[in-house]
Curated annotation (Swiss-Prot):
NCBIfam families: mnmG_gidA. It comes from the Bacteria. It is found in: Cytoplasm. Belongs to the MnmG family. It holds the Pfam family GIDA. GO terms for molecular function: flavin adenine dinucleotide binding. SUPFAM superfamilies: FAD/NAD(P)-binding domain. This is tRNA uridine 5-carboxymethylaminomethyl modification enzyme MnmG. Its main location: cytoplasm. Its cofactor is FAD.
Amino acid sequence: MNKYEVIVVGAGHAGCEAALAAARMGCRTLVLSICLDTVAHMPCSPSVGGVGKGHLVREIDALGGRMALITDRTAIQFRLLNTKKGPAVWGTRTQNDKARYRISMKHCLESEPNLDLKQAHVESLAVEGNRIVGVIDQLGVFFGADAVVLATGTFLRGLVHIGTTSVEAGRAGELASYPLANQLQRLGFTLGRMKTGTPARLGRRSIDFSRFREQHGDEAPKPFSLFTDSIALPQVSCFIGKTHQRTHELVRRHIHLSPLYNGTIRGVSARYCPSLEDKVMRFPDKDFHQIILEPEGLDTEEVYASGTGNSLPYDIQLRLIHSVPGLEEAEVMRPAYAIEYDFVQPTQLKATLGSKLVEGLYMAGQINGTSGYEEAAGQGLWAGINAALKAQGRPPFILDRSEAYLAVMVDDLVTRGTNEPYRIFTSRAEYRLLLREDNADLRLLEKGCELGLHSADAAKELRERRGAIRNELERLRLTHVRPSAQVNQTLAENHSPPLDAPAPLDKLLKRPELNYSTVAILSPPPEPLSSKVTEQVEVECKYEGYLKRQEAEVAKFRQLEQAAIPEDLMYDDIPGLSNELRQKLGAVRPLSLGQATRIPGMTPAAVSVLMVHLRRRAQGGPFLAPVLDPGVNMHSQKKKLA
């Protein structure tokens, strides 16, 4: 039977999360992949997470996705980054066994009762009127669906470049998809062109590791997932080295052979993951660039040479690698390459990641102009949830920017669009003190439960933990410690000033040199508390003032977010708006005044005009007084229209 409620095209990180979400929400779901041997493949770095990206992984886990759990099962190194800064920008990063990750995720898909996994090369979408009804593969087989998620990665008109050699491919050795890209254009979608790449893979036995600095993982690794009880695999090291002036000279001398610099590649490169050619040419004064050797797994000789990505001819690549101290004898098992591919300008999508042009069509991952496994997985989960809700006739699932990094990413894409590969950063979030890795479950797990992506037991555990956090914060506030020789000795051992008067425990915990463990020595809780509780208590206590200030900012932000704009609003009928802004508003079709303020080029005056129009339109309905501040970050006069 070829009729499904949700079909997902592509089985990369976006496709896997989309399919699992839809299936677990009760939809009969089909995943179609060009090759079932590369489900959840990691075509570039053998790692997950990092600053910002780790936040996404935790949020995926909290909502009910599977990336965090599979990452923990297959991780061979854990590191918590940015620990010298505040907890808002801490980021977990893992090295992963690529083969085990792929196998584990595929097993997860195959074990899901509502989910079918098939190998097929989708060539076209079946559209009736302006509504999706299914897909058709290369063999002419039709698969019907109420909703379709496109998670095509780099396969739309993919073109791999190594020197003067260019090959049509979605990844090295895999078929590209040209008919589907052509059809998207015929349907009216605006496509752009982007470029990414991957470095060489080296043979482990051919590397002189003594010339590199060993980088160990954390001694007490903390998993990504709430549901991971222990770390399963042996932990290994990475190794840090650097390029040599010989390396840079080789790049400069042969730059005319790089497709990136001779005009062959027209796609826009990733700003935050530059190739070696870009680093050498853009930063000529730098004496060296960092190289990190990352193991690709426990059972393979392949080592990922991070920092050596380029698109130069193979013979030049060999010379580049051999110019690096410690890699003089290195065997190149796979050459570096660049890849160009098509993407759909994401302003053509709604906040659900559903298309504005074709009802029931959703898009997730690199097709939306993003880069990174984590960004793809997050969009896949978001799109899969909404595709399932669409198929079931239920209201859509949308978060706002104050609730999750996932929402920041989606809002950036659908409101502002992108002309270069988009990557998440903590700096993109206005309310990052509230959107920490450590509280992702407190923010989002209940929503995952409501969607049917978590069990009742998970919801019960969350309620109990939330209660324990609340009770301990209250105990710290009400319990006073009196000065004594023992108390002051404990404080002195932690380089903290002595007490000369009774002090509440929460005030002591606010001292930067003290942590919860020390305060608990002075006055232990009635019952032992889990680390999940005590870590949250410490953060909420130490940063209480900052958190309250940001919560007040969120309250202002939500005033604008709650001022809805009708989807059918005719912007051409609003006097006082420039033609440029009418076009932008008509293209994005913001759902709220808040979203309208974030459209590039939107001015405070234009927002005021829009507010006046909405207020007049709503005469007889609710008055829009709460939204007289035309934007949290636009510094306009709040009483201008009073």
